[in-house]
């Protein structure tokens, strides 16, 4: 999707809101797939690009930052297979850096935040970033009592029984260890053990595992601990959670203590005093990477002194005192055998490359993303040439890049290897599923042609209808257990009118239709009395549904989970929401203005919602659905006692009692949004000595202004 979008600098506020809504939904979905299901659909590099774009947009438009922003979340909610464990201290993720310049900026940022400290006075540790499964091990009175996965950072899964089978994890600690100790680290599978496991699977004629990380994660989540014991999982310790006493005052000292207690620690961890030294070690580890017996995807830098870590503190989802410097993507050469066109829920035609199998970074790759029609032609998202304008043709020798677990991308073509007679690829102008016209819309505001070609068939198109149903029952929508992709496809394809499900309301009429049918579902292959009863129970359990889940489940373009929650909070009930959307059909009037005034809903998103409600077929489906389900009223946001909660604050001029970064962090911790510029949406401007144009603009707009002492008095110091 990123290739289809403007640069951040080109976005206006409405477009930025639309982008943030899309990114919030995408990142939440990929977090669940990666952390909750161990079934990622995109590479780490693509995920990082989505995350980075979200952060850049929020940085440019701070007034659009919401409480449920992806920049304030970690991971995904734990599954229901294992008992939940609430972490005593959250397991936060790390910010990423992608270049030497970014790494230098991280070091400079630490010095800037901490104030006047001489260069070379702050020590940093550097260690490999293990590509495994994050784990928290809790010891009470020196005995292992709980092992929990990261989960969503706040709540993980209890996998204690399985972790006890990992021989290198101590069951008890020495007598000098504190009463309460939480050791955090990474569980992984060695490359050699992974290769041996796959050799065993091949000898038995069974499907091979994809990569060590997913295999390690799946092995740890076995219901039978004996299976975990046979998988030869390993562990590196590198951090901690709750500690009743601190055995050291530096990062390196803590890790050395872990080693003394019997935990494996990474031998490549070292301490340095400059960005140059950190980068030298980074490139050394990068060169050693192919020879290591474990997968790594970067190097983690941390401020060594724990008192400085405490001063630097945390952002909403990551510490300021650490960053992960990611490695560049891995590449390989292979032949392009063909191009398949997939049709998604919104009708988007997405090209996927079929490749001669090739191993990239230890994983066999057979498919790669080609993004869109223009990407195949060698044209970028703003019309600029990519790959020096070289197009991609079937039969080409291509360079495939992989930086994560699943679909890689084609980044270039080897022109000297192009077969004689290879023809330019002709992107289809009709849907390969239903035969309807496939068109590229023109953006009414910019006049530019959309990069995505879409099927115009709507619900007539089987692919769109099936994907709509899959979306409707997905985890963040109605979350109906027992209705997965295969079951949806089965019901959709059925020719029996008492079994067939073609629209969402038919899910809720299935049981009634079955009562009148001689062809019982329980007699169908893959079903039985128990499974059918559980399916009906799961369906009936969703007859009462949270308003935001209902709105999200409708599959309105540009309306992700975050936007659905915004709408639910703003309108409170479906009656109010539905009536307002119908009233806004003319794209004018009070209802239209009210929709556009919601913080986080821009005109593009608003127009998509209203267009959905103008379509008679959609209204018919929604009406039938509301005869079967009852939307719950939305909960109001929890109030806070902070006098600046929800307000937009701008700091300008010099601050004398704290650094600018510390002031920003304090304001955000109290629920305020900190902006870099003054606008009519600004609530408070805190002006220090040397304040200039921002203070003038605040006075011009009538924005409340105060000095640093008044600000500190307002927030209570």
From Swiss-Prot:
Zn(2+) binds at residues 431, 434, 455, 461. One of its GO terms (biological process) is DNA replication. InterPro entries: BRCT_dom, BRCT_dom_sf, DisA/LigA_HHH, DNA_ligase, DNA_ligase_AS, DNA_ligase_CS, DNAligase_adenylation, DNAligase_N. Its EC number is 6.5.1.2. GO terms for molecular function: DNA binding; DNA ligase (NAD+) activity; metal ion binding. Residues 639-717 form the BRCT domain. The keyword NAD applies. It catalyses: NAD(+) + (deoxyribonucleotide)n-3'-hydroxyl + 5'-phospho-(deoxyribonucleotide)m = (deoxyribonucleotide)n+m + AMP + beta-nicotinamide D-nucleotide. Keywords: DNA damage, DNA repair, DNA replication, Ligase, Magnesium, Manganese, Metal-binding, NAD, Zinc. The active site is at residue 129. NCBIfam families: dnlj (TIGR00575), PRK07956.1 (NF005932). Belongs to the NAD-dependent DNA ligase family. LigA subfamily. This is DNA ligase. It comes from Rhizobium meliloti (strain 1021).
């Amino acid at each position: 999707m990123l290739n289809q979008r403007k640069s951040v600098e080109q976005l206006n506020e409405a477009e930025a809101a639309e982008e943030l809504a899309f990114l919030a939904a995408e990142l939440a979905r990929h977090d669940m797939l990666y952390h909750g299901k161990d079934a990622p659909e995109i590479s780490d590099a693509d995920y990082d690009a989505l995350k980075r774009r979200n952060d850049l947009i929020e940085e440019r438009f701070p007034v659009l930052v919401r409480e449920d922003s992806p920049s304030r979340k970690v991971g995904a909610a734990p599954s229901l297979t294992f008992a939940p464990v609430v972490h005593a201290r959250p397991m936060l993720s790390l910010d990423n850096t992608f270049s030497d310049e970014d790494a230098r900026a991280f070091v400079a940022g630490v010095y800037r935040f901490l104030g006047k400290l001489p260069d070379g006075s702050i020590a940093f540790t550097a260690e490999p970033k293990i590509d495994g499964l994050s784990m928290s091990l809790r010891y009470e009175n020196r005995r292992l009592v709980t092992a929990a996965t990261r989960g969503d950072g706040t709540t993980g899964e209890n996998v204690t029984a399985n972790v006890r089978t990992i021989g290198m994890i101590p069951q008890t600690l020495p007598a000098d260890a504190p009463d309460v100790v939480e050791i955090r680290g990474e569980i992984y599978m060695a490359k050699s053990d992974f290769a041996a496991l796959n050799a065993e699977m091949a000898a038995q004629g069974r499907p091979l595992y994809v990569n060590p990380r997913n295999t390690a994660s799946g092995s740890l989540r076995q219901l039978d601990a004996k299976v975990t014991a046979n998988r030869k999982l390993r562990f590196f310790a590198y951090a901690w959670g709750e500690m009743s006493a601190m055995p050291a005052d530096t990062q390196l000292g803590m890790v050395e203590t872990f080693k003394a207690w019997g935990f494996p620690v990474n031998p490549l961890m070292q301490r340095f005093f400059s960005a140059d030294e950190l980068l030298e070690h980074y490139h050394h580890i990068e060169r050693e990477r192919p020879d290591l017996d474990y997968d790594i995807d970067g190097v983690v830098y941390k401020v060594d002194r724990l008192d400085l870590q405490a001063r630097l503190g945390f952002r909403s989802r990551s510490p300021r005192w650490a960053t992960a410097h990611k490695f560049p993507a891995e590449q390989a050469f292979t032949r392009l055998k063909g191009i398949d066109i997939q049709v998604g829920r919104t009708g988007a035609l997405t090209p996927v490359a079929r490749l001669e199998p090739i191993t990239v970074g230890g994983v066999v790759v057979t498919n790669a993303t080609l993004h869109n029609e223009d990407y195949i032609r060698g044209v970028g998202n703003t019309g600029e040439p990519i790959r020096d304008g070289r197009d991609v043709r079937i039969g080409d020798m291509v360079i495939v890049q992989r930086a994560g677990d699943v679909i890689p991308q084609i980044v270039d073509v080897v022109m000297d290897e192009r077969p004689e007679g290879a023809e330019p690829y002709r992107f289809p102008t009709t849907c390969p599923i239903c035969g309807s016209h496939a068109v590229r819309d023109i953006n009414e505001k910019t006049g530019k042609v959309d990069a995505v070609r879409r099927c115009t068939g709507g619900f007539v198109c089987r692919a769109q209808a099936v994907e709509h149903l899959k979306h409707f029952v997905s985890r963040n929508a109605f979350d109906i257990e027992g209705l997965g992709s295969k079951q949806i496809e089965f019901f959709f394809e059925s020719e029996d009118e008492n079994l067939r499900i073609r629209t969402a309301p038919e899910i809720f009429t299935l049981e009634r239709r079955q009562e009148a049918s001689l062809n019982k579902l329980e007699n169908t292959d893959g079903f039985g009395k128990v499974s059918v009863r559980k399916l009906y129970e799961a369906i009936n359990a969703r007859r009462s549904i949270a308003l935001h889940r209902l709105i999200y489940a409708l599959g309105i373009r540009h309306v992700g989970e975050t936007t659905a929650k915004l709408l639910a909070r703003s309108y409170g009930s479906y009656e109010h929401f539905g009536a307002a959307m119908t009233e806004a059909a003319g794209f004018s009037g009070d209802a239209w203005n009210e929709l556009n005034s919601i913080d986080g809903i821009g005109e593009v998103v608003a127009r998509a919602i209203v267009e959905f409600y103008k379509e008679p077929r959609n209204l018919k489906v929604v009406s039938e659905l509301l005869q079967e389900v009852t939307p719950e009223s939305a909960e109001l946001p929890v109030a806070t006692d902070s006098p600046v909660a929800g307000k937009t604050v701008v700091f300008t001029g010099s601050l004398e009692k704290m650094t600018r970064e510390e002031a920003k962090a304090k304001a955000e911790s109290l629920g305020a949004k900190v902006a870099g510029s003054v606008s009519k949406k600004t609530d408070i401007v805190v002006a220090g000595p040397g304040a200039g144009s921002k203070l003038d603009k605040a006075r011009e707009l009538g924005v409340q202004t105060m000095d640093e002492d008044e600000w500190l008095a307002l927030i209570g110091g």
